[in-house]
Amino acid sequence: MTTRPELVLLDIEGTIAPISFVHDVLFPYARARLAGFVAAHGDEPEIAAALAELDAIAPGAPPVETLLALMDRDAKVGPLKLIQGRIWAEGFAEGALTSRLYPDVAPVLRAWHGSGLRLAIYSSGSEEAQRLLLGHTPDGGLTALFERFFDTRMGGKRDAASYAAIARSMAVAPAHVLFLSDVADELAAAATAGIQVCQIVRPEDGTIASADYPTAPDLAAVAAAFDRPDPA
C-alpha cells in the first residue's frame, strides 16, 4: 500500500460479480443447451476442432457426455470454455442473458477510468466470456473501460509467473499494479511477483478473509484504502 497503483487488475467471480451468477445462471444455461449447440454447429471448423480436442481427452466418448463431465468438475479446459462462450454469446445477443455485477462496481470502475487509472481483467473464464459478461450489464457496456482481458492463456492464476507476465505485457512495474481477488492463493501468487494485492470479501459469496493481505468489502473501500478516485 506504499505505492499508488497505476493499473488495477481485477478478478471477476467473487470480486466484481457474484459467484452465484456464474454457477447458478451461466453454467446451467450452457449445460441445458450443449447437446443442441453441438448438433447445430458441430460441422463449423472452430467447433469441430474443439470436438476433436474432446476426443483426445476422452477417446470414443460422446462429446456432449465429455462436456458434461468436464462441467461437473468445473474443469478449465479450452474446448469447454469455447463452447460455453459461444452458447452464452447467443444468449446475450438474444437478450436471454444479462450479467449481474455488484452495485458498487460500475460507478467505481467508471470513476477510476475517468481519472486515467488503467484497468484490466484476469479471470479463469475465457477472454470472450469476460467481454460478454462486461458488455451486457444492467449498467450498460463496460468493456471500453478495460485495456486488456487476460485469461489462463497467460498461465495459472496461482502462478506468480502469470502476474509478472501480465505486468510486462502492460509495460508497468509490478509495484505499480494492484490486483483485486477474493481468492487468497491468487493474491499470494501476485504478491510473490511484487504486485500489490487486496482481497475483496463479499458477504454474499461467503468469502473468508485472509489475515495475510489487506481486505475490502467492495471497490469503494479499495478506492479509499489505495488513494484512488471513488464515485462520491
Curated annotation (Swiss-Prot):
E.C. no: 3.1.3.77
Root EC class: hydrolase
Co-factor requirement: Mg(2+)
Keyword terms of this UniProt record: Amino-acid biosynthesis, Hydrolase, Magnesium, Metal-binding, Methionine biosynthesis
Cofactor note: Binds 1 Mg(2+) ion per subunit.
GO molecular function: 2,3-diketo-5-methylthiopentyl-1-phosphate enolase activity; 2-hydroxy-3-keto-5-methylthiopentenyl-1-phosphate phosphatase activity; acireductone synthase activity; magnesium ion binding
Catalytic reaction(s) noted: 5-methylsulfanyl-2,3-dioxopentyl phosphate + H2O = 1,2-dihydroxy-5-(methylsulfanyl)pent-1-en-3-one + phosphate
Pfam families: Hydrolase
Similarity remark: Belongs to the HAD-like hydrolase superfamily. MasA/MtnC family.
Subunit text: Monomer.
Name of this chain's protein: Enolase-phosphatase E1
